[in-house]
Amino acid sequence: MKRIFSVSVENRSGVLSKVSSLFARRGYNIESLTVGETHDPTISNMTIVSSGSPRDLEQIEKQLNKKLDVIKVRTFKEEESVSREVILVKIKYVAQNRSEIIEICQITKAEIVDTTDTNMILLLCDTPDRVDKFIDMVKKFNIVELDRTGTLAMKKCK
């Protein structure tokens, strides 16, 4: 079972290390992690995606709530959230492939953000599943470099 943890923490040095070590010490894998300052510069929000049994995920939530620097922990399932990832992919291409790459970008709403005669950098912001599918679509063009953010997520509006 996959769970998204949205953790508000004090925005200070060492907090990320403390939270990630909680997962490591207990043998839980962090599948995705993003951290950023909120509208309040004294608070950061960590979005952590992890999988495990319902008991394990409940234990993670309890342990997070015990941390001094943790202000609030919210958990939700993927279907209860709006989530996005950003990916930058540098691909090699030849002139004959250019129209196919442009078509893929139009279909997926990806952008071509940089180009030379032999390389292109593509940008996509979408759901994690669609980002995975996009990667599968562009693999055939010889991926030179790929950089992907972790999941950003918020609970859906009620």
Report the location of each language-model feature.
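Long, contiguous binding/interaction regions
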Residues: 1-45, 49-158
